[in-house]
Amino acid sequence: HEGLRYGCAAVVAGGEVRGLVPKEKLPTYSIYYEGRTFSRGYPYQLGEHRGVPFGDLIFEFDFGVVAPEVCEDAWTTECPMRRRTYSGAELVVNISGSAFRVGTDQTRREMLITRAGDHQCTLAYVNLVGGNDGLLFDGGGFVFQNGKLMLDAPRWREGWEATTVDLDRTMRLRSENTTWRMDHT
């Protein structure tokens, strides 16, 4: 996009790419060197890439409002999830490439359940599985609705998992939570 290289989540529906959402938080620590290769997305960034919407986007579907994000974007307290849920996103989908380390699965679980509760949303998280350039990715995934575990997908294997969530419940819990309402107005 505009001569720069981004890591993006692509939203595909009805056989068409509906939008590209660039990763905002680029790690440059430990085994991660993304900041050396990629440009980061910015809050409220909007544009097009080859006729496809590009930037800080949320997507409205018949079932609800979806906000995609990429990996590290969920790991900071000032994450894009906060801005996007305050803009109406009910479902946040985080696609991740987090390498395996002992204890990381529990850390992910605790951090993501906190994010889903803090931001009064349903959060679907999926991690890469397999080996790549000497790194090992343990896969797995979670779905949390407003801080409650709805799905714990197995690690170390490819596959599909499904669960049902009630996005009306998410909206009802938001309206009942006076702290959340005050924080975002």
What are these regions (language model features)?
Residues 1-185:
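Enzyme catalytic cores with a strong preference for nitrogen-chemistry domains
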